[in-house]
């Protein structure tokens, strides 16, 4: 890549990674509602007596069955209650970082007394959360839309305190840069950008490794990571690099989905996507004992490639986005093992031929299953590419060009899978109570 082109794309690409790779405590969909409630509580100025919340169907899907960190409970009602009673309105995706046991008890009491209600709000916006808090004769409403922390409305007693213009940033979509760059340029940029400008990505390894260690220390969620490690000890699984990738990555997801009070470094608004883009690269880099520079460039490539692919998808969809985030770590591993774009291209094409169509049926402990499947596919696909074999453009939705293959996958997710999404949500909200 020539210096002029590097300079042209450097600022927007760095901005995107800094914007989309951020710490998040807890699954980001219920956290978005918690942030709306915390902000409403700030403007209410007193302890709320009742909470009425509304969320988009996709946010409901991702909030029904997932643990809310620090509470020992799952679901959107507890997220709204603890956000209102103990959330930090300035904390963004770490809104619940400083909650106390007393506040958790108060939040649970609100639920027991049926003072918190969460309904589906039919809206054209895939990501939408709204919290309305009541106390005495006061009422505060806060709405978040399109991005997990994008507050668009604050209203108190019917008067608008803050309202973001809907077209405020219509002409400055930060993802527009991806209309001008290719996957090859993503690779070349990651290899050539000044190292000091991407050192911040090392924090992703630190945060998600800590989460992985926590997931191996205690039984969280389905404790898949611990189970696989146990079976390595019993001899039923090999103690090899693939097993290490699956165990350490899945353990981080176990802890995250099981309610651990440690932040994940997220990607594209998702902690699991951040984990899938980080941990396989960390494990392989440690195994190879590579230099700090190579490690950082591999991590940066992984996260940027994951953002690049996810930018072509709806913010929330019926396609499990851990699969696309794992395509990022596939690129990072390919860089570590060969340093060649051709390996990256063959690897991602094979992944698309392998795990396309895994559905998102809501955030839950079972997300860790999809994480283990996706990262295993990524490593397998790199090994195939190193042996000059891959799913070719003669097969299925894969084409001879990586960017066209990515576009095909994302087109299916954006169009055809919309009907799947509706049916998944219908099934989830109509299940009988156990």
Language-model segment annotations:
Residues 23-39, 262-279, 320-324:
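Conserved phosphate/anionic-ligand binding catalytic regions in large, soluble enzymes, centered on
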Residues 112-259, 426-434:
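Signature of multi-pass transmembrane helix bundles
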Residues 47-51, 91-96, 118-119, 195-201, ...:
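Flexible, glycine/charged-enriched surface loops at secondary-structure junctions
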Residues 2-14, 45-59, 240-259, 291-309, ...:
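Acidic-glycine-rich active-site phosphate/pyrophosphate-binding loop
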Residues 4-5, 25-28, 58-62, 145-162, ...:
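A structural signal for small-residue-enriched, beta-sheet-centric alpha/beta enzyme cores
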Residues 34-130:
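Early transmembrane hairpin of solute transport permeases
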Residues 13-23, 58-66, 255-266, 306-316, ...:
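Glycine/charged-rich beta-loop-alpha catalytic/anionic-binding loops adjacent to active sites
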């Amino acid at each position: 890549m020539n210096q002029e082109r590097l300079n042209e794309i450097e600022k927007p690409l760095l901005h995107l990674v800094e914007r989309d790779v951020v710490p998040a405590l807890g699954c980001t969909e219920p956290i978005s509602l918690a942030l709306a409630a915390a902000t409403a509580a700030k403007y209410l100025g007193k302890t709320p007596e009742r909470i009425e919340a509304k969320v988009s169907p996709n946010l409901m899907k991702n909030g029904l069955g997932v643990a809310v960190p620090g509470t020992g409970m799952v679901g959107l009602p507890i997220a709204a209650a603890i956000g209102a009673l103990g959330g930090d309105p300035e904390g963004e995706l770490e809104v619940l970082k400083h909650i106390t046991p007393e506040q958790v008890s108060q939040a649970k009491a609100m639920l027991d007394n049926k003072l918190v209600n969460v309904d589906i709000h039919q809206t054209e916006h895939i990501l939408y959360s709204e919290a309305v808090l009541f106390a005495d004769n006061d009422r505060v409403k806060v709405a978040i839309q399109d991005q997990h922390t994008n507050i668009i409305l604050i209203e108190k007693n019917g008067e608008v305190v803050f309202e973001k213009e809907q077209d405020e940033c219509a002409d400055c979509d930060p993802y527009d840069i991806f209309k001008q760059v290719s996957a090859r340029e993503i690779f070349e940029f990651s290899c050539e950008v000044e190292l000091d400008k991407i050192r911040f990505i090392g924090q992703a390894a630190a945060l998600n490794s800590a989460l992985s260690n926590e997931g191996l220390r205690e039984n969280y969620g389905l404790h898949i990571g611990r189970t696989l490690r146990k079976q390595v000890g019993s001899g039923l699984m090999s103690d090899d690099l693939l097993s290490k990738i699956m165990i350490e990555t899945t353990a981080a997801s176990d802890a995250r989905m099981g309610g651990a009070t440690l932040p994940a470094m997220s990607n594209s608004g998702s902690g699991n996507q951040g984990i899938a883009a980080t941990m396989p690269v960390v494990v392989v880099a440690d195994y190879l004992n590579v230099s700090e520079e190579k490690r950082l460039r591999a991590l940066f490539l992984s996260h940027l490639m994951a953002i690049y692919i996810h930018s072509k998808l709806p913010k929330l969809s019926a396609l499990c986005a851990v699969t696309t985030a794992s395509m990022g770590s596939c690129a990072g591993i390919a860089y570590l093992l060969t340093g060649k774009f051709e390996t990256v291209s063959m690897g991602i094409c094979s992944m698309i031929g392998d795990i396309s169509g895994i559905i998102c049926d809501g955030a839950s402990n079972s997300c860790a299953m999809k994480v283990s499947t996706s990262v295993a596919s990524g490593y397998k696909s790199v090994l195939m590419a190193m042996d000059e074999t891959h799913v070719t453009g003669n097969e299925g939705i894969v084409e001879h060009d990586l960017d066209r293959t990515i576009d095909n996958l994302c087109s299916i997710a954006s169009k055809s899978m919309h009907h799947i999404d509706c049916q998944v949500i219908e099934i989830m909200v109509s299940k009988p109570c156990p």
